[in-house]
Amino acid sequence: MLLAGTDNTPAKEVEYLRLFENYPVDGIILVGTMFTAGHRKFLKETKVPVVVIGQRTSHANCIYHDDYGAGKAMGQAVAGFSKKGVAYIGVTRDDKAAGAARDDGFIAGLKNAGVTLFEENKRTSAFTLESGYESALDLLESKCDIDVISCATDTIAAGAIEAIQTYLKKQIPTNAADAGARMRYILENTSIRVTGFGDNQMLKAVTGGIPTIHFGYKTSGIRGAELLLDSIEKGEQIPIEMKLGFRLVGADPSDSENLT
């Protein structure tokens, strides 16, 4: 088994796909972010069985999450506890799942509840804590009247929490810092609520939990491996598309799930 990490770099993903094809390997599992013309060309031409996880494609077996439905559920939940205004830090819409689908779903969820997400309250971030921090700080320094910062990933949300601390210029008590409760202290001492997507367990441990979306990442990995083995054993087949559900957590009393 060979593993390769590309730091969400599309060109490097295609490079490694070609490398694996020529190695050769029996099959490939691609955990994708942005699908480019290079990705599509590879999937159309390759004779190696491929399973794509995290993105929807008609060119290979794929397992993807209901990002639109998850975004809509989060938007409706946020509308329920926001009393001022809502801000959203998304990622590039070139990522059809975490970018376009979550963004569109979130806006639709707010709209269903009669809440508008104004353009001046939107930012686009990279998939990093540092970029989330910079985007959130830019929002806060623009003096927009908000009480919720909703983020496309939990990693971005972690950066947003740190940005709140910088903006408010509050000193973290030594006992909170020493106990690993820095982020929890920040959230408990601000009127701004931060939400995310991904249900990151490390973030949950240091914050006590924020409203977020739990996706079936473990299930997608298991199903992906099963699909790949089946493709290797049976040869070329019509591509299978499998959509997994989600669970909204930490947003009482509006917690809901859609695990179909």
Task: Indicate where each model-derived feature is located.
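Flexible loop/hinge segments that line or gate small-molecule binding clefts
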Residues: 31-73, 155, 187, 198-210
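Amphipathic helical "hinge" segments at domain boundaries
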Residues: 1-26
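Hinge/beta->alpha junction and helix N-cap segments in small-molecule ligand-binding domains
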Residues: 3-12, 63-73, 89-111, 115-137, ...
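Short, Asp-centered acidic motifs that coordinate Mg2+ and/or phosphate
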Residues: 26-28, 50-51, 148
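Residues that mark the start of a beta-strand
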Residues: 49, 83-85
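Glycine-rich phosphate-binding loop signature in dinucleotide/nucleotide-binding domains
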Residues: 22-24, 81-82, 139-145
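Flexible loop/turn connectors
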Residues: 144-147, 156, 161-260
